[in-house]
A protein has these predicted regions:
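An acidic/polar, Gly/Ser/Thr-rich interaction patch typically located in mid-to-C-terminal regions
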Residues: 50-180
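Short beta-strand-centered interaction patches in the first periplasmic/extracellular domains
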Residues: 1-52
Length: 180
């Protein structure tokens, strides 16, 4: 049996939406829209508030150049296809292939953008241990500056606050992709 939160996560994923659970409420939002907002904080290399950091790159199931959506209706045998390539594409030349139900080309376009974005945000990740600050929460965006190829905006995917050995926050970050 599947839990309610798991069902909700699956529904959000299918719709290309993001889900955030806090102590008192569940928040569902369009990640692309939210990510377009200005970063709440900028961390500069050498900043005394950064206790430690780790930067990572993954090319496994990420760094796609475009996304091709193709769906054939089993009843009408009509095939709906759409390929999306963002203007800012710097991928590997790989095409992400998606076969999910869509009713028209507009739905295929929306799905292609969301699925490509979902995969490519996993390419660059970072984790920071910083001096404690209650304003750090999952879902907010921050910028890294002075970290060379990692200089960009990131979404906080997890913020673990700890009082052991002094107040610190462990931030898990994944890159924000703007424009799609």
């Amino acid at each position: 049996q599947t839990s309610d939160i798991k069902v909700l996560q699956e529904l959000c994923h299918a719709a290309g939406m993001a889900l955030k659970v806090t102590t008192l409420k569940i928040v569902i939002y369009d990640a692309a829209e939210y990510d377009a907002k200005p970063a709440a904080k900028t961390f500069k290399y050498g900043d005394k508030n950064i206790i430690s950091y780790k930067l990572g790159t993954s090319l496994t199931d990420t760094a796609y150049t475009s996304c091709h959506v193709s769906y054939t209706d089993p009843d009408s045998k009509e095939t709906i296809e759409y390929t999306y390539t963002p203007d800012s594409s710097t991928g590997t030349g790989q095409v992400l292939e998606i076969n999910e139900k869509v009713r028209n080309t507009e739905e295929a376009k929306t799905l292609a953008k969301k699925r490509l974005r979902e995969k490519n945000t996993q390419e660059l990740t970072a984790s920071l241990k910083v001096v404690g600050d209650v304003s750090f929460v999952a879902g907010m965006t921050v910028k890294l500056k002075g970290f060379q190829k990692f200089d960009r905006k990131y979404k906080v995917t997890q913020a673990k606050h700890s009082l052991t050995g002094g107040y610190t926050v462990d931030l898990s970050l994944k890159q924000v992709l703007e424009g799609y």
